C-alpha cells in the first residue's frame, strides 16, 4: 500500500492529479472512465470557493428541511386538524432521504454529477413548493416525501463534487466545512423555523428555499464544468441502457417499501388500529418479507448491490452502524419533542422554543470540536464512544424528569449533558465507519451511517408519536369537554378554552406524553452499551482500518 501511495502522489502536481498516458490515449479529453481517477479541472480560486459555498448552501437547505418542521408541529396540527399525522411530517422526509442515499451513491458514479446534483436540488425545491401550498395534511406529507428524495442526493452529491474539484491534500477541509453546515442546520432548524413562522408565517419556511436553491443552481451552471463519464473501466463507450442496467432499482424499491410498511405499522398500531388488527399485522408481515428479500438480493448482486454485503464482515463497521442506529434515534427524539414540551408546558412561542434549545446546539457543536481535535492527536475512538453512551443515557434520563415546575437552570444543564452525549455518539459513528473500511469503500461508510441515522429517526418518531397520541387521547376520558377533535386543534386552543383546573390536568397529561418520548431515548442510549465489548482501544491514527 505504501508503494501505491507513493505512486499516486507522484502523479499529483500543482493540485492536479495526472493520468498515465496509456489511460488517456484515444479518449476524449472531456470524457473519463467512471472508475478511474480523473484529472482535476483547472479552475480559479473564485470559482472553487463559489462552487463549494453553493454546495454548502444546498447541504444546509437539505439538512434544515429535516428539522425545521420540529418547531412547527403544534401549528401544523392546528392548521390541518390532524394531530395523528404529526410524526409523518418529519418521518417521511427522513425515510425518503435516508433510503435513497445508497441509490444516489450509484447514480453519481454513472451520470454527470453537475446535472444530477442540480436535479436533486430542483426536486427538493419542488417538494418545498408543495409544502408551501399545502392545504391539508396528506398534501403536506407528499411534499415532504418529494423534498426528502431530493435531499437524499444533495449531501452525497456535494461530497462527490468536492472530490472532483479539490486537490486531495485540501479535500478534508472543504468536506468538513460542508459537514459542519449540515450539522448546524440540523440543530438550528427549529430556531429558524420558529422565527420565520412567528413573523411572516410558517409557509415561508418552505417558500424561502426557492430563491436560495435557484441561486445555487445558477452558480453551478456558470462555474462548474466537470468531465463527462460515459466510458466503462475498459475505456469502451457505454450506452445509457448499460448505465441504467448497472443500477439496483429492485433493491432500492424493496428497501424503501419495507421501511414504509414498518413505519405505517408503528404509526397505526395501538392508535388508529389495534395491534392485532389485520392491517397492522399484514404491514409487519410484508415488512419482514421485503426486508429478507432485500437482504438476499443485496447478497446476490455482489458489488453491483446498493450495499456490498462483504462490508458486514468488518467488526468496526458493524459497531459504527449500531451506534448510528442508537444515537440517531436519541438525537431525533429531543429535536422533535423538546419544542413541543416548551410550547405546550412552558407556553413558549415557536421562537422561544427554539431559543430554549440553544444549550443542545452549543453542546453538540462544542463536543464535536473537542472530540475532533483530541482524536486527531490520539487516534482513539473508544473513549469517546463510552463517554457518549454515559452522557446520552444520563441526559435522556434527566430530560425524562422534566416537569412544569422544573427550574430554568436545570433545564439548561440537562440539555447540555444530553446534547454532548448524543452529539458525540453521532460523530463517532461516522468516524468509526470510515476508519473501519478501506479507502475505496469510504463512500459506503458515510452513506450507510446516514441510512442508519435516518431509519432510526423514522422508527423513533413513529414510536414516540404512538406513545404520545395514546397518552393525550386519554384526556377525552378524564375531561368531559375534550374530544379528539379538540385535541387536534392544538395546545393554544386548549389554553384558551379549558378552565384552570382542567388545564392543569391537561398539562400533566401532555407532560407525561412527552416523557414517554424521552423514555425511547433512554432505551436507545442505554442499548448502545451493548457495543462496548466489541470496541477497539487501539489507535486508528495512520491506519486504514479500525479492526483486524
Curated annotation (Swiss-Prot):
Annotated TM spans: 43-63, 85-105, 114-134, 146-166, 177-197, 204-224, 250-270, 280-300, 316-336, 357-377, 382-402, 411-431, 444-464, 518-538
Gene: TOXA
Deleted gene: phenotype: Leads to lethality.
PROSITE patterns referenced in this protein's UniProt entry, alphabetically: MFS
Keywords of the record: Membrane, Transmembrane, Transmembrane helix, Transport
The keyword Transport is annotated on this UniProt entry: yes
SUPFAM superfamilies: MFS general substrate transporter (SSF103473)
One Pfam family linked to the record: MFS_1
Protein name (database record): MFS-type transporter TOXA
Topology term for the membrane: Multi-pass membrane protein
Major place of residence: membrane
One term under GO cellular component: membrane
Places the protein is found: Membrane
Record family assignment: Belongs to the major facilitator superfamily. TCR/Tet family.
Lineage: Eukaryota, Fungi, Dikarya, Ascomycota, Pezizomycotina
Domain of life of the source: Eukaryota
Chain intervals with Polar residues compositional bias: 1-12
GO biological process: biological process involved in interaction with host
Classification via PANTHER family: AZOLE RESISTANCE PROTEIN 1-RELATED, MAJOR FACILITATOR SUPERFAMILY
Keyword Ribosomal protein in annotation: no
Function: MFS-type transporter; part of the diffuse TOX2 gene cluster that mediates the biosynthesis of the HC-toxin, cyclic tetrapeptide of structure cyclo(D-Pro-L-Ala-D-Ala-L-Aeo), where Aeo stands for 2-amino-9,10-epoxi-8-oxodecanoic acid. HC-toxin is a determinant of specificity and virulence in the interaction between the producing fungus and its host, maize. TOXA acts as a HC-toxin efflux pump which contributes to self-protection against HC-toxin and/or the secretion of HC-toxin into the extracellular milieu.
Molecular function per GO: toxin transmembrane transporter activity
Miscellaneous notes: The genes involved in HC-toxin biosynthesis, called collectively TOX2, are organized into a diffuse cluster that spans >500 kb. All of the known genes are duplicated or triplicated within this region, with some variation in copy number and chromosomal location among different race 1 strains.
Species this chain originates from: Cochliobolus carbonum (Maize leaf spot fungus)
Record region (Disordered): 1-33
Biased composition, class Basic and acidic residues, residue ranges: 14-27
